[in-house]
């Protein structure tokens, strides 16, 4: 198996090294792992692409590249430049430092990389490690993802359903904020929505009077409705949420026919 690995935390992020280990385990001795990751931190960029300006692409070693762009840019660089003659069988994005459950999924560059892979016709999965009191002080806070990541990916590769949608499925996988041995299992979930304040902005001033803002995140330890991603994670389960790039609110289409 030939696997492309990317992320949004950047080429030097510890989670990327964890995902490289997972990918190497999946690829096996006859397989290949290619890395095309952002040269710099790209958290929160979502599915953006840099189509208004070029991106520098640097070769750092065998099958290892850094692009000065978003995770989606990295996937495009891989599929259409560095791997154009040897395309990947699978794209893995992550392992993100922090959860991408609930509304975080909407902002996530980690998911943006996986989504672009799916739009390009390649099976893709985003992997994220929830941080909380149960794992942030561990020697390796990513140990749940490292221990269980390959198993989850294998199960999804063998179980992916056939569908007639033009939008290929991709998967949002979130590992709970616990030690590897405390993971309770896997739950297939829907995307949750946390109640109360989500992201916000705080106004501040520099010593010379310049005005600026800090974007602040909401409470990540707030659970969501049962059977959703964040609820599963905070209960010690790995969440797997199947996703597509189709943003249509299908439940509203019929109700809106009256305006035609």
Swiss-Prot record:
Gene3D superfamilies: Survival protein SurE-like phosphatase/nucleotidase (3.40.1210.10)
Catalytic activity annotation: a ribonucleoside 5'-phosphate + H2O = a ribonucleoside + phosphate
Record's subcellular location: Cytoplasm
Names of the cofactor(s): a divalent metal cation
Sites where the protein binds a divalent metal cation: 8-9, 43, 96
EC numbers on record: 3.1.3.5
Cofactor: how bound: Binds 1 divalent metal cation per subunit.
Record-level GO cellular component terms: cytoplasm
Main location: cytoplasm
GO molecular function term, any single one: metal ion binding
InterPro entries linked: SurE, SurE-like_Pase/nucleotidase, SurE-like_sf
Keywords assigned by UniProt, alphabetized: Cytoplasm, Hydrolase, Metal-binding, Nucleotide-binding
A Pfam family that the UniProt record links to this protein: SurE
Its job: Nucleotidase that shows phosphatase activity on nucleoside 5'-monophosphates.
Protein family (similarity comment): Belongs to the SurE nucleotidase family.
Protein name (database record): 5'-nucleotidase SurE
The organism's taxonomic lineage, starting at the top: Bacteria, Pseudomonadati, Pseudomonadota, Alphaproteobacteria, Rhodobacterales
């Amino acid at each position: 198996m030939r696997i492309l690995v990317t992320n949004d935390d950047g080429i030097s992020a510890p989670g990327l090294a964890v995902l490289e280990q997972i990918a190497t385990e999946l690829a096996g001795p006859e397989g290949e792992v290619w890395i095309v990751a952002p040269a710099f931190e790209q958290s929160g960029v979502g599915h953006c692409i840099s189509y208004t300006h070029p991106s520098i692409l640097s070769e750092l070693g065998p099958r290892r590249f850094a692009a000065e762009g978003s995770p989606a840019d990295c996937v495009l660089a891989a599929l259409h430049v560095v791997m154009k003659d040897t395309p990947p069988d699978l794209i893995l994005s992550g392992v993100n430092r922090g959860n991408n459950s609930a509304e975080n999924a909407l902002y996530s560059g980690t998911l943006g990389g996986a989504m672009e892979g799916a739009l390009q016709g390649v099976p893709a999965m985003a992997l994220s490690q929830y941080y909380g009191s149960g794992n942030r002080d561990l020697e390796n806070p990513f140990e749940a993802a490292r221990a269980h990541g390959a198993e989850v990916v294998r199960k999804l590769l063998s179980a992916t359903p056939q569908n007639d949608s033009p939008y290929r499925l991709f998967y949002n996988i979130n590992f709970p904020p616990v030690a590897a041995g405390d993971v309770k299992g896997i739950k297939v979930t829907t995307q949750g929505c946390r109640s109360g304040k989500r992201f916000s902005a705080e106004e501040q001033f520099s010593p010379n009077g310049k005005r600026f803002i800090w974007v602040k995140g909401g409470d990540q330890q707030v659970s969501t409705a049962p059977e959703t991603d964040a609820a599963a994670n905070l209960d010690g389960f790995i969440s797997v949420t199947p996703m597509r790039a189709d943003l249509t609110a299908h439940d509203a289409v019929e109700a809106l026919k009256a305006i035609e």
